[in-house]
Regions:
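Structural register within alpha-helical repeat arrays
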Residues: 29, 63-64, 97-98, 132, ...
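Short coil/linker segments at helix-helix boundaries
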Residues: 137-167
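Residue-level detector of the short coil/turn that links helix A to helix B
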Residues: 3, 37-38, 72, 106, ...
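Short coil turns that delineate tetratricopeptide repeat
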Residues: 20-21, 54-56, 89-90, 123-124, ...
């Protein structure tokens, strides 16, 4: 039982040896180890075993990913998403997690590819639109200062803003209440692309957000 650590740990070997119940046993062990700081390493090891044995089981993946991220281990987290998407290419959660992680690592082109691959499976996770749109906006912002006196860079900057527009507009449509996320990006997109009508509308929205 989960509320009896000693009993659970006492019979862990027997539980794990029973193959039909192996998945359930691993989850029980993980939750038992998680209850105490003294067994945290065992918790991590159990998650590793669980993911290696059942890579398409999100339980082990999400908890392992959270541990890596809370300890600032982004490369390890990325390696985990590589394994997960490789083992379960149709898993939307894994693809979304990879796209989100790549965006946080400022690996923008890769995050767009990852977000697009998730959207190709399903658009049920609206944040994938936000990730791809944000990545394009960030790349545009990186060129802003130099683009003032460089026509080629300005063209590239505007291209990024243009690419970002449909993603961010779709995100806004799906998540109209999240003005805090799409308000500022769309403001900058419309401003730089000289979208007069759209800019006037978004200016009124952003005024209430900022």
């Amino acid at each position: 039982r989960l509320d009896d650590m000693q009993t659970t740990l006492k019979y862990r070997a027997q539980a794990l040896s029973y193959k039909p119940g192996n998945l359930v046993a691993l989850k029980y062990l993980a939750e038992t180890y998680q209850k105490s700081d003294s067994t945290f390493n065992d918790y991590v090891k159990t998650l590793d075993v669980g993911f290696a044995t059942y890579p398409c089981e999100e339980y082990f993946f999400t908890r392992s990913l959270n541990i890596y991220m809370s300890n600032q281990k982004q490369e390890e987290a990325l390696a985990l998403t590589d394994k997960a998407t490789g083992a379960c290419p149709q898993n939307l959660v894994y693809r979304y997690a990879r796209a989100h992680l790549l965006l946080s690592m400022e690996r923008f082109p890769e995050s767009i590819i990852a977000a697009d691959s998730a959207l190709a499976l399903s658009d049920s996770i609206a944040d994938c639109y936000y990730i791809a749109g944000s990545a394009n906006v960030y790349m545009a912002e990186q060129l802003k200062d130099k683009a003032v006196q460089d026509k080629a860079l300005k063209k590239k900057m505007l291209e990024y803003y243009s690419n970002a527009q449909p993603y961010m507009e779709k995100y806004r449509k799906r998540e109209p209440a999240r003005k805090d996320k799409w308000g500022s990006p769309l403001y900058n997109i419309y401003l730089n692309l000289n979208k007069g009508k759209e800019f006037d509308e978004i200016s009124k929205v952003v005024r209430w957000v900022l």
